[in-house]
Amino acid sequence: MSEYIRVTEDENDEPIEIPSEDDGTVLLSTVTAQFPGACGLRYRNPVSQCMRGVRLVEGILHAPDAGWGNLVYVVNYPKDNKRKMDETDASSAVKVKRAVQKTSDLIVLGLPWKTTEQDLKEYFSTFGEVLMVQVKKDLKTGHSKGFGFVRFTEYETQVKVMSQRHMIDGRWCDCKLPNSKQSQDEPLRSRKVFVGRCTEDMTEDELREFFSQYGDVMDVFIPKPFRAFAFVTFADDQIAQSLCGEDLIIKGISVHISNAEPKHNSNRQLERSGRFGGNPGGFGNQGGFGNSRGGGAGLGNNQGSNMGGGMNFGAFSINPAMMAAAQAALQSSWGMMGMLASQQNQSGPSGNNQNQGNMQREPNQAFGSGNNSYSGSNSGAAIGWGSASNAGSGSGFNGGFGSSMDSKSSGWGM
């Protein structure tokens, strides 16, 4: 007749009753069925209080001389398996410890001037235990700057506070991580979406009810005065991102959902994209190179505002390195032409070139860099190039080169 013996993994644990065979033995397979990896049993001797092992022969556990009795038997494990189990427990404990997120300082924006640190602490204490609050003040006047900092004990409290807007002393305030806490290389995954094309009859409660079908809505904000848009903040950033770009129907009106990205992030993206423009004298629509007195060559959509009659090359893309190389090449090539013209002028009767044809006087068109002040005194239609502070007038001849030695200016007469 079989009986049940009490077996446990540790002496202090609650035992499990395991059935024995008809001959009074216990199969090791019966033990391993309840304690995987077990290789034997042991028990504490009531007389000596020492641990004794149970005899094991070919997978069969034999009862002690006095029988199984009411003793509690402890399971034995191989040492290697026990070591592995201990290491697994230790590694899992380390992983759990690393998974615990630490809290950090949160910046509170839009604080009323009258709000004190005590007011701030009392408000945020309703969410959880507050470690620190601080209202930034002007060193000279001692007045509030309109923002402060707060830190909580629990990370869950921090997440909850960041997921919603806060009415503090009659004013809406935002609480978020400072910019220094966010990596610029990581993409910003916002939980807030922009809802465009809203109508005045849409209320915050209606928007909250509508968007609740997609996920938990933490906050709904409609700016006042009404400007035909609203902001909806979800608890999960993945839900917010999945709705971006969608056109949804609310109360029979089509609204467009997009990412509510802060302005400073948009500016950062424009800076990283390498675009030039928007500044006087730069690339783009606000002027260009060559705003000099001698007439410059403008890049982009310039309106020809140079004093010397600058010419535009159209709206094409060019970088500063290319422009500098082009200017250097032009100065070098035209300088060589000027030297050739000077040599020809020195071989003339008096160094003064006369126009050999009956050419009509026409205004010059000049390309220049620096403070060139060419005057239109060339005989014939001349396109003059000059550099440095030339103050004279270059005399050209038909189909050749012309130069004035007195003013050290050179021109190409055409």
From Swiss-Prot:
Name the InterPro entries for this protein: Nucleotide-bd_a/b_plait_sf, RBD_domain_sf, RRM_dom, TDP-43_C, TDP-43_N
Q: How is it modified after translation?
A: Hyperphosphorylated in hippocampus, neocortex, and spinal cord from individuals affected with ALS and FTLDU. Phosphorylated upon cellular stress. Ubiquitinated in hippocampus, neocortex, and spinal cord from individuals affected with ALS and FTLDU.
Q: Where is this region: Disordered?
A: 261-303, 341-373
Q: Which residues carry this modification: Omega-N-methylarginine?
A: R293
Q: For this UniProt entry, what's an example GO CC term?
A: nuclear speck
**Effect in UniProt of substituting G294V:** In ALS10; a patient with bulbar signs and dementia
Compositionally skewed regions (Gly residues) per UniProt: 275-303
**What binding partners and quaternary form does the record give?**
Homodimer. Homooligomer (via its N-terminal domain). Interacts with BRDT. Binds specifically to pyrimidine-rich motifs of TAR DNA and to single stranded TG repeated sequences. Binds to RNA, specifically to UG repeated sequences with a minimum of six contiguous repeats. Interacts with ATXN2; the interaction is RNA-dependent. Interacts with MATR3. Interacts with UBQLN2. Interacts with HNRNPA2B1. Interacts with ZNF106. Interacts with CNOT7/CAF1. Interacts with CRY2.
Functionally, this protein is described as follows: RNA-binding protein that is involved in various steps of RNA biogenesis and processing. Preferentially binds, via its two RNA recognition motifs RRM1 and RRM2, to GU-repeats on RNA molecules predominantly localized within long introns and in the 3'UTR of mRNAs. In turn, regulates the splicing of many non-coding and protein-coding RNAs including proteins involved in neuronal survival, as well as mRNAs that encode proteins relevant for neurodegenerative diseases. Plays a role in maintaining mitochondrial homeostasis by regulating the processing of mitochondrial transcripts.
Name this polypeptide is given:
TAR DNA-binding protein 43
